[in-house]
Amino acid sequence: MDIKKQTELIFEPILLPQDYKFELPENVEEIFINVASEVDLNGLYHKTTKSPLLLLYFQGNAKNMQNFLDNHSMILDWGYNVLVTDYRGFGKSTGMIDGEQNMYNDAEQIYDYALQLGYRPEDIILYGYSMGTSMAAYLATKKDAKALILESPYSSIAEIDIFGNQAPAYQLNTAARADEITIPTLLIHGEQDDVLPPDHSERIFANLQTQEKEMTVISKGGHGDLKSRSEYKESFNRFISNL
């Protein structure tokens, strides 16, 4: 299977017109980050004076930034700065994903953009949800950061039943990379996640090099409903307060 077909198999983008207007919460602005020639990633930046910390957030697979606003924007109310972008070909982002390294390179550019905003590495918490956990974990091995949070991660593409070994161009093997991660790490998974069962987190957790690691499995939690659970917020707050 060629890389174009592999890409189409894995990714589920929904485009938005360039003139699409988001209904943005207070203190949130729309941004574009140029990552390559004629490739600009659309994103949102939430600025607050309540904390110096930045959650550098990498989204899941399906849909686009509107999905973040509809289903995950509660993190904007947690008192932290937040930077989140769409992937190439998602939402209002231009270009197309054409390989795993392409995604990692974009993640590094987003990190560099955070530095340009004035954040120091020790201010940055790398935060990935679902597919975004691969980018967050990758950055944890390449860039300095305060901590890493992986919500509903997958250990590798090959370990996801619906993909198996059909997309060798996309390994996205966080479990294999975990032995290079040395910063404090929190994994959170839903007990009843029917997209990515908790054993994905267990494999990553077992391989982490850092000894400052925690894993929370939320009772009766699913794949996309964890942030609204009190157990999630308690685990998140405890982890941050101990950094």
Range-by-range predicted roles:
Residues 1-34:
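An N-terminal hydrophobic leader/cap segment in hydrolases
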Residues 61-74, 96:
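The serine-hydrolase catalytic nucleophile loop
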Residues 71, 174, 183, 197-206:
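Short alpha-helix in the alpha/beta-hydrolase fold that links the catalytic acid
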Residues 75-94:
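Conserved alpha/beta-hydrolase
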Residues 97-118, 176:
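Alpha/beta-hydrolase active-site loop
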Residues 180-182, 187-193:
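Short beta-strand/loop motif that positions the catalytic acidic residue
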Residues 192-196, 223-224:
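Acidic catalytic loop of the alpha/beta-hydrolase fold
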Residues 202-224:
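Catalytic histidine neighborhood in serine/cysteine hydrolases
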